[in-house]
């Protein structure tokens, strides 16, 4: 179970790196923010790619499970950074995504 907690923490950090790496260019392209924001965006996306290499197990399975955590973190970003309160549909969708992640990660006799 401790291993699962570590993997979930790594998923959350990976999701933040991906979201930041995509959000900063979005700000530059749609909100006329300074172009220099593309530098930390590139660093964040590089960090995201590196973090993906730290996940144990088959890449496809890890990426599929990571998607569930990504959805939850993205909705937290929506709420805390964008200032938009998630709807109940957002929350249900996130719960379904997290349930899918749990099914993938907790399958019996998995090799992570």
UniProtKB/Swiss-Prot annotation:
Membrane-related topology note: Multi-pass membrane protein
This protein's UniProt keywords: Cell inner membrane, Cell membrane, Membrane, Transmembrane, Transmembrane helix
One GO cellular component term: plasma membrane
Keyword Isomerase: no
Localization, UniProt: Cell inner membrane
This protein's record includes keyword Transmembrane helix: yes
Main location (coarse class): membrane
Ranges annotated as spanning the membrane: 7-27, 34-54, 59-79, 89-109
SUPFAM superfamilies (alphabetical): Multidrug resistance efflux transporter EmrE
Family to which the UniProt record says this protein belongs: Belongs to the UPF0060 family.
NCBIfam families, sorted: PRK02237.1 (NF002586)
Protein known as: UPF0060 membrane protein Daro_2632
